[in-house]
Amino acid sequence: MKYNYSYTPQPHTEAWLTYIRTQEQKSLERDEATMNSDAVPIHPMRFCREIRDFLDEDTTIVGDGGDIVSYGGRVINVSKLGYWLDPGPMGCLGTSTGFAMAAQLARPGQKVLILYGDGAFGLNGMEFESMVRQKLPVVSIIGNDGVWGQIKYPQKAIIGHATAAELTPGIRYDKMVEALGGYGELVEKPEDIRLGWPLRPS
């Protein structure tokens, strides 16, 4: 995310700031290759880059997930305060539909997008019926990798295996949204991500 702020460098912090900026640049260079990868399954950074390149500065983005929201925070630039909404690092999953409906009511006519993990979608997906019934246009994009990513990968790193961190792969969440009165589309290739962006109501 980008924020506007002013800072007056101090002599004792210059070396530290130079080091931090150098490391940040190296990280951005590493990320660039991943953001442009055509690999299948789609890497979350490529997924988020496609979203970033489409959005305008008046789009409210609601993050609801683990890994996918972490990647989104690195890749998607938000230039206005209050246009990135999530419950924070100690918040809970499942808040996005309420946030998104409130954003659409507060800013009628502006784009509202939910960036979902598949686990988070399982906590509030039925609320698409509420958005359809109240005619609140919200676009939702689900990173569907079939795992609780922020549970599985730390468990494997710490204890060597994962417990209760799997979801059923390949669930057709797009069909669920259609059953609730919305529009759904499945996208499996990076080059089709833009084609899978109809900007229709949920």
Predicted segments, located by residue:
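Active-site diphosphate/adenylate-binding microenvironment
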Residues: T22-A103
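Thiamine diphosphate
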Residues: M1-Y5, S70-G72, I76-S202
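Alpha-helix initiation/capping motif
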Residues: P9, S37-V40, E166
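Terminal amphipathic helices with adjacent charged low-complexity linkers/tails
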Residues: M1-T18
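A general, composition-driven signal for non-globular sequence regions
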Residues: Q10, E24, L28-E32, F128, ...
